[in-house]
């Protein structure tokens, strides 16, 4: 028995609430099995008061989306001086902003796709760049709001400028990179295996293919050339360090090998709060490296600190 009291934060009030609840329950259950004393907290606006009264030894942050991974809850935990998992205030805020995180990664030598930051209302009826391209909300996760504009579309989709859009006015318009979906997790200061994601019946790795059982296949380690494998690991670790991440992060890539085995590798984004659901990538990647889910979570708890 470890004796440590771990508060697992989950749920919250972002668009990724259901994903967070799934992550939180899986993590809390496994940590209990590891011998930790666990309190599950479905986060609301009173979370600071709850934590002051609870006085946990460590907070395991299983929140996703705004407030959970944008530096906000991290700032609360720093103020309360409660050690916590994952990245700190600055890295969390930076990584949540796809455009700014991309600029920092590119400055560190990571290969990125061409893009521009826009207000969604400025897109109008004319293409902001030559199709195909992707429109992404700047501060959303789980592929919420991602729109792929194909070459044969005469105009941008109307939903981007409509009242139905609920992902903020700032969007990133990014050149579409064809090819295979690859991802690489970083644990501490170590790049783990590269994993290929193969969506089953989906155009890309969207919300359903991420969280619906059987909607995607994870191949870890990915079947790619050794030099490409190492290149992806290097870029994942470079982005992790440049953005200032701590604990576990996961970087997503596109690998276009349609015309040669060497192909082209492009970094897409980094996730400082990767999912920990039964269908999530990081647990699968860790398992392929011989690290069980319990060992992964225990390492994260023991790695927790303030001033991250």
From Swiss-Prot:
PROSITE patterns: ATP_GRASP, DALA_DALA_LIGASE_1, DALA_DALA_LIGASE_2. It is found in: Cytoplasm. Pathway: Cell wall biogenesis; peptidoglycan biosynthesis. One of its GO terms (molecular function) is D-alanine-D-alanine ligase activity. Residues 102-302 form the ATP-grasp domain. It is an enzyme of class 6 (ligase). One of its GO terms (cellular component) is cytoplasm. It catalyses: 2 D-alanine + ATP = D-alanyl-D-alanine + ADP + phosphate + H(+). ATP binds at residues 128-183. Keywords: ATP-binding, Cell shape, Cell wall biogenesis/degradation, Cytoplasm, Ligase, Magnesium, Manganese, Metal-binding, Nucleotide-binding, Peptidoglycan synthesis. Mg(2+) 1 binds at residues 252, 269. The keyword Nucleotide-binding applies. The keyword Coiled coil does not apply. Its main location: cytoplasm. Cell wall formation. HAMAP family: Dala_Dala_lig. This is D-alanine--D-alanine ligase B. It comes from Brucella suis biovar 1 (strain 1330). The gene is ddlB.
């Amino acid at each position: 028995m470890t004796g440590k009291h771990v508060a697992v934060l989950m749920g919250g009030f972002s668009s990724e609430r259901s994903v967070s609840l799934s992550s939180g329950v899986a993590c809390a259950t496994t940590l209990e099995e590891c011998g930790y004393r666990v309190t599950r907290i479905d986060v609301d606006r009173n979370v600071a008061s709850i934590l002051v009264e609870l006085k946990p030894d460590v907070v395991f942050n299983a929140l996703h989306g705004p407030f959970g991974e944008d530096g906000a809850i991290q700032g609360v935990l720093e103020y309360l001086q409660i050690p916590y998992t994952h990245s700190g205030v600055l890295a969390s805020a930076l990584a949540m902003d796809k455009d700014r995180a991309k600029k920092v990664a590119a400055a560190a030598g990571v290969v990125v796709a061409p893009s521009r930051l826009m207000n969604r209302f400025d897109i109008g009826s004319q293409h902001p760049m030559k199709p195909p391209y992707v429109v992404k909300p700047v501060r959303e996760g789980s592929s919420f709001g991602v729109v792929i504009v194909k070459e044969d579309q005469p105009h941008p989709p109307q939903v981007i400028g409509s009242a139905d859009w609920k992902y903020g006015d700032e969007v990133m318009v990014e050149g579409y990179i064809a090819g295979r979906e690859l991802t690489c997790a970083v644990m501490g200061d170590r790049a783990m295996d590269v994993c290929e994601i193969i969506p089953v019946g989906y155009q890309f790795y969207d919300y359903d293919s991420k969280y619906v059982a059987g909607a995607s296949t994870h191949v870890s380690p990915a079947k790619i050339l050794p030099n490409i494998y190492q290149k992806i690991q290097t870029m994942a670790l470079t982005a992790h360090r440049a953005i200032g991440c701590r604990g576990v992060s996961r970087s997503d890539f596109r690998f276009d090998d349609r015309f040669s085995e060497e192909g082209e590798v492009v970094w897409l984004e980094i996730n400082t709060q990767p999912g920990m659901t039964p269908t999530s990538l990081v647990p699968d990647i860790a398992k392929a490296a011989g690290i069980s889910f319990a060992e992964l979570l225990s390492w994260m708890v023991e790695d927790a600190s303030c001033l991250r």
